[in-house]
């Protein structure tokens, strides 16, 4: 249990260090625009999956290649910043959860709009039924 807490703390520090490096030390504007969303470390701290996202989806492939080329820089910078016996192997992965969330949000909005149209149609039908019933009731009273 304590090991899991340590892994989470180290992962949090990794995220902070890499984010800081992206903001301060990376000169490539596209790569610097990436946002680190999560760091997943193995229990023995030998492997790190670093999830990132970027505003321009079309830049994702370029950024992936740039991260791949910059692995050594990030590993050495992490080694200097954090006191770890072993600096993990880094794997940068594009985080699709934001894109997925946006797609889900769009589908929800479409469903809400469709529901709204159905409700409006049902309201019109009900109003017409009430009017028809009122006319019939008035006609019966007049007889």
Swiss-Prot record:
InterPro entries assigned to the protein according to its UniProt record, in alphabetical order: KH_dom-like_a/b, RbfA, RbfA_dom_sf, Ribosome-bd_factorA_CS
Keywords: Cytoplasm, Ribosome biogenesis
SUPFAM superfamilies linked: Ribosome-binding factor A, RbfA
GO terms of biological process kind: maturation of SSU-rRNA
Protein localization: Cytoplasm
Coiled-coil portions: none
Domain of life: Bacteria
The keyword Acyltransferase belongs to this UniProt entry's keyword annotation: no
Keyword Ribonucleoprotein recorded: no
GO molecular function: ribosomal small subunit binding
GO cellular component terms, semicolon-separated: cytosol
Region ranges (Disordered): 123-143
Predominant place of localization: cytoplasm
Function: One of several proteins that assist in the late maturation steps of the functional core of the 30S ribosomal subunit. Associates with free 30S ribosomal subunits (but not with 30S subunits that are part of 70S ribosomes or polysomes). Required for efficient processing of 16S rRNA. May interact with the 5'-terminal helix region of 16S rRNA.
HAMAP family: RbfA
Entries under PANTHER family matching the protein: RIBOSOME-BINDING FACTOR A, CHLOROPLASTIC-RELATED
Family: Belongs to the RbfA family.
Assembly and interaction partners: Monomer. Binds 30S ribosomal subunits, but not 50S ribosomal subunits or 70S ribosomes.
Name of the protein this chain belongs to: Ribosome-binding factor A
Underlying gene: rbfA
């Amino acid at each position: 249990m304590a090991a899991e807490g340590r892994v989470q703390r180290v992962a949090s520090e990794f995220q902070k260090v890499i984010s800081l490096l992206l903001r301060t030390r990376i000169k490539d504007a596209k790569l610097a625009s990436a946002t680190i969303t999560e760091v997943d470390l193995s229990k023995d701290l030998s492997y790190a999956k670093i999830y990132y996202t970027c505003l321009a989806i079309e830049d994702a492939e370029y950024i992936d290649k740039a991260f791949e080329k910059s692995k050594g820089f990030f590993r050495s910078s992490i080694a200097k910043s954090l006191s770890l016996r072993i600096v993990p192997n880094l794997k940068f992965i594009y985080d699709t959860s934001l894109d997925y969330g946006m797609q889900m949000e769009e589908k929800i909005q479409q469903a809400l709009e469709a529901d709204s149209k159905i409700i409006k149609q049902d309201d019109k039908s009900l109003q017409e039924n009430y009017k028809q019933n009122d006319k019939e009731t008035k006609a019966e009273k007049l007889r």
